[in-house]
Amino acid sequence: MNCKAVTISLLLLLFLTRVYIQPTFSLISDCDETFNYWEPLNLLVRGFGKQTWEYSPEYSIRSWAFLLPFYCILYPVNKFTDLESHWNFFITRACLGFFSFIMEFKLHREIAGSLALQIANIWIIFQLFNPGWFHASVELLPSAVAMLLYVGATRHSLRYLSTGSTSNFTKSLAYNFLASILGWPFVLILSLPLCLHYLFNHRIISTIRTAFDCCLIFSLTAFAVIVTDSIFYGKLAPVSWNILFYNVINASEESGPNIFGVEPWYYYPLNLLLNFPLPVLVLAILGIFHLRLWPLWASLFTWIAVFTQQPHKEERFLYPIYGLITLSASIAFYKVLNLFNRKPILKKGIKLSVLLIVAGQAMSRIVALVNNYTAPIAVYEQFSSLNQGGVKAPVVNVCTGREWYHFPSSFLLPDNHRLKFVKSGFDGLLPGDFPESGSIFKKIRTLPKGMNNKNIYDTGKEWPITRCDYFIDIVAPINLTKDVFNPLHLMDNWNKLACAAFIDGENSKILGRAFYVPEPINRIMQIVLPKQWNQVYGVRYIDYCLFEKPTETTN
């Protein structure tokens, strides 16, 4: 682990994974990513996209400043190259992955300097075999970017806790200020324990000076972001405050996060078991006894405690602490291995066994995510290869119904294709469309019709199926009273163009949905423990398909 060649190999593998493998193969795990970030970014780059109520100037709880760095990358790509539109999607993901690599590389160097090179290398291994990080680090979400920025904050926190450097304390807070003001104000919670540490260990005068510097950084960052968002919305738009007001201060039974679903207290423990190998979680608990870093561990547990108390829970809410979990685990693993320094053979056996279990469980989870949940991206990508020589209309309508929430991004659609929603069993508020005429500011500032913050259905967002040119759906039974498209009984000359395998959640067992088991092992388990194994493992797939309604031709 101390060998320079090992370090270089791990970093090269990390770079390859973050910049190529993840952007290419990772899934989109949340429709909020699609409709609240990919679609507005598509509007900035290509002039059209779906619009959620959060982007209505009436509510303005999503930040355009958050999207501007990605627009600045994609604008020259589209201006000076002839790349097809779907490349915007993968280039953006690659940029996120590259940013993740840079943050991880710098933290690796800091861990090596402040703690030990072996701990740093173990941390990289735990980061590589981290199913949660695999998809989170290339997601276009404020919580995902906050996760990456907090790696930068952790780097400076380590330096501060090792040297007492005030400048590194300030830099750590600056990273978190940026993450909070750009779109997710709750990450400020993570800095509270570090602030307490500084307060307890410095004189009043020094604390006041540092507080002034931090307030200045916070104010300048907030001013820049608020001015940017206010220009886009055409009115004063303190987005971070609006998010806090909607989700906490003004939350009620009719509006607020809880109307989108609530989960029990054990949702997050189960989620962590899916996103981290079991040895990493066990080691992370042991790592908190490295008391020199107590402000970091206090941040970790404060975050879990605060979000466990909230009825509305989502996987992405835990993203910012992912790096702390692997850091704590790597410290603990290093200390455990040192207990066996006098028994080198046993030490090597323990090290190899733990790393193999970590890698095996992580790969099982990652392969399951790719195999089970990436069909929507694969199917929508087919539009880039379809022969559009005989385009049937200036605008081609790509429709979907019950599968609306699996739509990945309009970047996967050609320039003249638009996503439309037909009637289905969904009874909440669907996204509408940004206007396509006028300047970008006019499109953003126009008050959309039929928007509300109570998730109330709006019929104005329905599209008649008779005006659909393509349709995306799973080949599964429908609700005959609510769904208007039946993929099992195609009518009106609809043809099946392309399909990809998608997990059948209702008919798959819990382990089959969550983990991939190689077929030889699956067969062995069916022989050894047939009854018990079949109760917990089984995978069934359905087709996720693209259908076309051919144009009528005249002789």
UniProtKB/Swiss-Prot annotation:
Its EC number is 2.4.1.259, 2.4.1.261. One of its GO terms (molecular function) is alpha-1,2-mannosyltransferase activity. It is an enzyme of class 2 (transferase). It is a multi-pass membrane protein. Residues 29-62, 108-113, 198-213, 290-316, 371-555 are lumenal. The keyword Magnesium does not apply. Its main location: endoplasmic reticulum. It comes from the Eukaryota. It is found in: Endoplasmic reticulum membrane. Pathway: Protein modification; protein glycosylation. It catalyses: an alpha-D-Man-(1->2)-alpha-D-Man-(1->2)-alpha-D-Man-(1->3)-[alpha-D-Man-(1->3)-alpha-D-Man-(1->6)]-beta-D-Man-(1->4)-beta-D-GlcNAc-(1->4)-alpha-D-GlcNAc-diphospho-di-trans,poly-cis-dolichol + a di-trans,poly-cis-dolichyl beta-D-mannosyl phosphate = an alpha-D-Man-(1->2)-alpha-D-Man-(1->2)-alpha-D-Man-(1->3)-[alpha-D-Man-(1->2)-alpha-D-Man-(1->3)-alpha-D-Man-(1->6)]-beta-D-Man-(1->4)-beta-D-GlcNAc-(1->4)-alpha-D-GlcNAc-diphospho-di-trans,poly-cis-dolichol + a di-trans,poly-cis-dolichyl phosphate + H(+); an alpha-D-Man-(1->2)-alpha-D-Man-(1->2)-alpha-D-Man-(1->3)-[alpha-D-Man-(1->2)-alpha-D-Man-(1->3)-[alpha-D-Man-(1->6)]-alpha-D-Man-(1->6)]-beta-D-Man-(1->4)-beta-D-GlcNAc-(1->4)-alpha-D-GlcNAc-diphospho-di-trans,poly-cis-dolichol + a di-trans,poly-cis-dolichyl beta-D-mannosyl phosphate = an alpha-D-Man-(1->2)-alpha-D-Man-(1->2)-alpha-D-Man-(1->3)-[alpha-D-Man-(1->2)-alpha-D-Man-(1->3)-[alpha-D-Man-(1->2)-alpha-D-Man-(1->6)]-alpha-D-Man-(1->6)]-beta-D-Man-(1->4)-beta-D-GlcNAc-(1->4)-alpha-D-GlcNAc-diphospho-di-trans,poly-cis-dolichol + a di-trans,poly-cis-dolichyl phosphate + H(+). One of its GO terms (biological process) is dolichol-linked oligosaccharide biosynthetic process. InterPro entries: GPI_mannosylTrfase. One of its GO terms (cellular component) is endoplasmic reticulum membrane. Keywords: Endoplasmic reticulum, Glycosyltransferase, Membrane, Transferase, Transmembrane, Transmembrane helix. The chain crosses the membrane at residues 8-28, 63-83, 87-107, 114-134, 177-197, 214-234, 269-289, 317-337, 350-370. Residues 1-7, 84-86, 135-176, 235-268, 338-349 are cytoplasmic. Mannosyltransferase that operates in the biosynthetic pathway of dolichol-linked oligosaccharides, the glycan precursors employed in protein asparagine (N)-glycosylation. The assembly of dolichol-linked oligosaccharides begins on the cytosolic side of the endoplasmic reticulum membrane and finishes in its lumen. The sequential addition of sugars to dolichol pyrophosphate produces dolichol-linked oligosaccharides containing fourteen sugars, including two GlcNAcs, nine mannoses and three glucoses. Belongs to the glycosyltransferase 22 family. This is Alpha-1,2-mannosyltransferase ALG9. It comes from Saccharomyces cerevisiae (strain ATCC 204508 / S288c). The lineage of its organism: Eukaryota, Fungi, Dikarya, Ascomycota, Saccharomycotina.
